[in-house]
């Protein structure tokens, strides 16, 4: 899963264009593709520096039979009622952070059309910060090696990778990388566009919640994914290069034409 998530993050900052085709429930006009490829993606802000020591910050996943483990399994069982429903469909549309549906929903939360064509400084900041989350996420996943719920408690999941016996490609469950990156970006973009902080944080929380609806994560995976995102955010806040990029993103978003989406 870390390879899949990394590819999506890099695509956000280095693709020639990020389409803005929203899902039917969130119509957003399409962005015009850039005519030429964008410059090479810079590395993360922590490149060449020790990554976040996530094992000192993240609690171990619930012990089998504990109250949290029971709650996780109950939530997974209950989520079967949502198969095929609105959250299930939204989770499918937003399987990748670089997907058009994900970017359209994030744009609506920020109140500006996000793409390399329209907000390049913001997109590079978002992508670089996402790269910095991959290393600690991978360390935690490999250390705890928690199975995905659909591999232990069975049942359908919304990610097609979970089918046809290739579910192992999704990797381990704990913590949720999608939840972590969604919350990291929510914290960063709340600083870059403070007038939209409430909507942005709602989107960030929803990124993790959709992974439960997708039935690829336990509740505690998602909760502690947010802890991962917050830990990376706190570390980045001390980096001068990140602060400089944040200043550029603030100015860029303040000058961007407002984007109003249906409520």
Report the location of each language-model feature.
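Sec-dependent signal peptide recognition
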Residues: 1-7
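Histidine-centered active-site/metal-ligand motif
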Residues: 2, 178, 217
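N-terminal signal peptide c-region/cleavage motif recognized by signal peptidases
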Residues: 14-15
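Hydrophobic alpha-helical bundle signature of multipass membrane enzymes
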Residues: 23-213
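Interfacial helix-loop-helix junctions of multi-pass membrane proteins
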Residues: 206-237, 244
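C-terminal membrane module of polytopic membrane proteins
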Residues: 232-263
């Amino acid at each position: 899963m870390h390879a899949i998530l990394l590819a999506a993050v890099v695509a956000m900052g280095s693709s020639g264009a990020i389409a803005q085709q929203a899902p039917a429930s969130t119509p957003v006009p399409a962005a015009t593709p850039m005519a030429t490829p964008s410059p090479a993606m810079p590395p993360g802000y922590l490149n060449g520096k020790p990554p976040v020591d996530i094992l000192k910050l993240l609690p171990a996943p619930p012990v089998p039979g504990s109250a949290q483990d029971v709650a996780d399994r109950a939530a997974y069982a209950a989520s079967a009622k949502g198969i095929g429903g609105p959250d299930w469909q939204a989770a499918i549309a937003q399987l990748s952070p670089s997907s058009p549906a994900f970017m359209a929903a994030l744009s609506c939360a920020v109140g500006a059309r996000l793409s390399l064509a329209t907000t390049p400084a913001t997109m590079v900041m978002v992508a670089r910060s996402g790269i910095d989350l991959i290393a600690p996420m991978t360390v935690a996943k490999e250390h705890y090696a928690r199975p995905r719920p659909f591999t232990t408690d069975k049942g359908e999941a919304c990610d097609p990778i979970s089918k046809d016996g290739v579910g192992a490609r999704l990797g381990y469950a704990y913590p949720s990388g999608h939840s972590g990156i969604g919350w990291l970006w929510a914290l960063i973009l709340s600083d870059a566009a403070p007038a939209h902080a409430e909507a942005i944080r709602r989107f960030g929380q929803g990124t993790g919640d959709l992974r439960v609806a997708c039935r690829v994560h336990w509740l505690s995976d998602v909760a502690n994914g947010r802890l991962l995102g917050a830990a990376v955010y706190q570390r980045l806040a001390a980096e001068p290069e990140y602060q400089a990029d944040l200043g550029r993103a603030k100015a860029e978003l303040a000058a961007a034409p407002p984007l109003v989406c249906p409520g």
